[in-house]
Amino acid sequence: MSHTFYNSLDSSCKSPFGAIPAGQAVTFNLTVPEDLGYVDPHLVLTKDRENPVHYRMEFTGQTPRVNHFTLTVTPTTSGLYFYHFDLYTDFRRIYRTPGGEGVLSWTEGQEWQLTVYEPDFKTPDWLKNGTMYQIFPDRFCEGKPNKEMPFADRIYRADKTGEPYFWPTEQDEGYLNMDYYGGDFAGIQQKLPYLRDLGVTCIYLNPIFEAHANHRYNTADYLKADPLLGTNEEFSALCLAAAREGIRIILDGVFSHTGSDSRYFNREGRYGPGGAYRDRNSPYRSWYDFDSGYPCGYRSWWGFETLPEVQEDSPSYVDFICGKGGVIDTWLNLGASGFRLDVADELPDDFIEKIRTAVKSHGDDKLLLGEVWEDATTKEAFGQRRTYLRGRGLDAVMNYPFRNAALDYLHGGDVAAVADALMQICENYPAPALDCAMNFLSTHDTERAITAIAGEPCNGRDRCWQSKRCIPADKMDDAVRKLLLGYAMIFTLPGVPCVYYGDEIAMQGYRDPFNRAFFDWNSTEQRLRGPIKTLAALRRSCDAFDGGRLEIVRAEGDVLHYRRVGKTQTAEIILNRGPHLLAEEAFGKNTEVNPGGFTVLVEDNEPEHVGYFSVY
């Protein structure tokens, strides 16, 4: 392999950049060295799982020692397309290498990707320059203290700083998750001024429906708030109070399974004689797949008997979730601004499309976010390529690839590879989806950010090892500095940053349940709050962070320097994970970046408006 002929990240080679709506013309420009002799280059474009189409490129002229070719094509249908270039008379092809560059190859290589999405794909504008905040409801704030438990099998935790319970003998079914710290709607409402001051514009709540585990992913009643959190009316009051603070609330939609301990399945008998498990004539029977071939007699989520899977093609289930007066209708009418779909990969595309229709019937400003751990444009699940990020399904997804890239950078990984990972997502995702992608460093499903960044690697160790393990006190200064560097990254990349509750006070914890401790409202760790607040304010005031394109300026050594280009402003972000003071040029001037620090500089795009907007 030799010489670069094409770079998909360069607008002089491919225009426009990245994904395009169906009906949009896209132009490819190829340069071929003269010393290769006569060539007849073709673009080979293949729609996913279809036959390739060869397009002959047009010769447009010469510059010294280089021949130029061009081609414009207009994909008319949405889908996933892949392409490379054939030179034909040279019997070689041009394939993609890291960084989007093309090289000559005698053998097959990696193709470029072209995502084509629905031309009417729109996503909520209110989210795009905002800041999200994820709350695990039982563990944030108790507004009505010293509760009586609504069910006898719940354990009330008055010791708010105590570690969440786990019992090693219960590993077959995980563990009971029956200890409750009492977090509630009243507590969240009480802390709305705190969240507003932090710069939060959207709260993402983990499940709030009645359920019999503290995580509430085993839904018992979709139409009723868990009584420990409050009533449906109190949830509605919370949404109204949040709106007055400029904050919207989205909910977790767990629609791939219910709890076995639910009014729908009712294996445990808590809900009387009915339910699909106990009554063959139950109206919920068609929701589930009962078969003696399953170890427990029914299909369950990843084999957990307490989580029977639903059949998302059951008409009565679809109507219950998506129909008038159904789950989506009920909670959006109560004041929610959208849903995050749990395990979106495990929901059929047509079911997600019906959910979208139900959500958007309440207005285009309602959000539908999906849990996807990989590149959502190329994701395959159960033998099917998923189509949910092309404009008919999800608005956006959780941006795990960006989290992985941020952690790789903070752990000393190859910076060029980090930059390539970032640009691949920017290149593959439709702009409406990228602008709403949820960027984060930690969630309820991952280690706490500071633990993942600076803690001893878990490496699959059990919960006994994870219990009470923390970063040594003499390492905390460095850990906090790295955590802030990580947050600077996710606040300034395309997408919407999300702070997991407690990250702003450097809460620690390995995997579930240690990443779900109660928020320490007496914490003296306040070093992160100010910078996070400032970054959130910068996002709201600078249009470079509202859909501005990403350009990599330099990615080598310990330096990751990138640019966001908006309609009226441009921002340059310089991250320095290294131990030495860095001098870097931005906007034609030298600026210094502290060891382990970052700098954000902003200029107006108009020639008469020059100079730095802000420096951190």
Language model features with spans:
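Substrate-binding/active-site clefts of carbohydrate-active enzymes
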Residues: 136-201, 208-334, 355-361
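Aromatic/acidic polysaccharide-binding cleft in carbohydrate-active enzymes
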Residues: 138, 382-383, 389, 435-471, ...
